[in-house]
Amino acid sequence: MNIDVVQLLDQNPILLIFVVLAIGLAIGKIRFGNLQLGNSIGVLITSLIMGHLGFSFNAEALTIGFMLFIYCVGIEAGPNFFGIFFRDGKHYFILSMTVLVAAVSLTYGLSHYFGLDFGLSAGMMAGALTATPVLVGAQDALNSGLATIPRNMDFSLVLENLSVGYAMAYLIGLISMIMFAKLLPKLQKQNLSDSAQQIAQERGLGNSSQRKVYLPIIRAYRVGPELIDWTDGKNLRELGIYRQTGCYIERIRRNGILAHPDGDAILQEGDEIALVGFPDSHARLDPSFRNGKEVFDRNLLDLRIVEEEIVVKSDAIAGKRLSDLNLSEFGCFLNRVVRAQIEMPMDLDIVLAKGDVLQVSGEKSRVHGLAEKIGFISIHSQMADLLAFCSFFILGIMFGLVTMTFGQVSFSLGNAVGLLLSGITLGFLRANHPTFGYVPQGALNMVKDLGLMFFMVGIGLSAGGKMFEHLTQVGPQVIGLAFIVSVVPVVIAYLVGAYILKMNRALLFGAIIGARTCAPAMDVVNEYAKSTIPALGYAGTYAIANILMTLAGTILIILS
């Protein structure tokens, strides 16, 4: 049986798409030392080569890809978007705007000075900033008519310029950002480890950010004379058992009767108490608790320890510090804090925002009591609320179609902005109403990534025909300009953050990387800081940066 692969791919466009995806994703896993190409650039390079070899596909059919991608970006940003001005939020907003304004200004000025073709500058900026939303915003402005294509060009040629510019600049942007993360602290003689420790000391973090996470365990002890002497007649509230031992007294058996103690309870000789705490806390208990006094009573030990993810929802909690929760009052143990899918240091001074996820363990009723106070327990269902997902998608498209008129000028926001706004709204509502609009994070990631990959395949196959012509004509020039656009805004943002905003350097480097939406560079900064504290800064800028980058692509292509 003979199979003509070329003919097979020509006649089966769906097969072509997934062949390009499979090859591109495999290429994206290639590493050069610590540098990985990544899925986006792998798929784009593959689709450009396939397009150059003569394979084609109707790019219009793949616009659903960028629509899904930008919609999911909005959903992820929604819970934290409106909390951007909490505590350091203004600093993060200023840094994101600094990178954006500097990049757009530089790209606009350099592209006009060197006479870059229409569309090439937007693609170059998207690659130099490793920010795919720039590319999405630019193409949507073309599709919606916000940007006017020059008379001597057509849509397909502009699309070629966008994709080739992105492909040529992306690696420059990625490498330069990683080098920035490695070299600038040394050039400035900054010790990121010291900066991280400084924040830890100022905010009461200590070493908790690096501790391993365990489930608490239950052990029971009989109260003897030594323990009575230790309590000195004080009640449980006065004793502060948790402060001294790291364990909570969950139950007391007295005269055969089981009870849940309150703060006024006073221990008596012969009581049997059930303590809940981490294994190391039990090991550190005073000998008056442990020596020969452990008991094994099934009824006393019959407690259900659970670990739940609690989503912050309460207006009374959002904007307050983690320490204000007083977890010791609830008998709960905090294991992790996650914001925008980024694990945060266990900083007692971190300001909580709606949508933050606290991984908490403890006795079931206590954990549920805490959840009622601060928000809700995250749904562990594998079912998505597709009705809400689709409805808000429709609203986003409809909003993007609305035409506004100012005098003689009429314009619409376009699909990208409309879907961003509807996605942010859905994400925000999801953070406040646990049963509404739920989409499992894994499903959301898959839709977002697959949408982005479809988008890359579409523009790559459409643009690949003249790829090598572009490389020979403007390749060196675009690469040089991409380096400038990648590095200069970052340096400006560093100067603003360090000398005007006077930010801690560990937070500043994390924030700049978030403003550049360059996740690979975060590993470098965390390694240099010997801490996850820079993630505080990264999470602060990442959500707003994704939104601003989309708008930047729209603005730049209109100005061009």
From Swiss-Prot:
Any one GO molecular-function label of the UniProt entry: monoatomic cation transmembrane transporter activity
Membrane topology: Multi-pass membrane protein
Segments forming domain RCK C-terminal: 205-292, 293-376
InterPro entries membership: AAE_transporter, RCK_C, RCK_C_sf, Transp_YbjL_put, YidE_YbjL
Gene3D superfamilies, sorted: Regulator of K+ conductance, C-terminal domain (3.30.70.1450)
Keyword entries, A-Z: Cell membrane, Membrane, Repeat, Transmembrane, Transmembrane helix, Transport
Pfam families, per the entry: Asp-Al_Ex, TrkA_C
Any single GO BP term: potassium ion transport
Top-rank taxon, per record: Bacteria
GO cellular component, one term: plasma membrane
Transmembrane regions listed in the UniProt entry: 8-28, 37-57, 66-86, 91-111, 164-184, 386-406, 409-429, 443-463, 478-498, 506-526, 539-559
Subcellular location: Cell membrane
Annotated HAMAP family: YbjL (MF_01015)
Family of this protein: Belongs to the AAE transporter (TC 2.A.81) family. YbjL subfamily.
Annotated protein name in UniProt: Putative transport protein VP1232
Species, as recorded: Vibrio parahaemolyticus serotype O3:K6 (strain RIMD 2210633)
Lineage: Bacteria, Pseudomonadati, Pseudomonadota, Gammaproteobacteria, Vibrionales
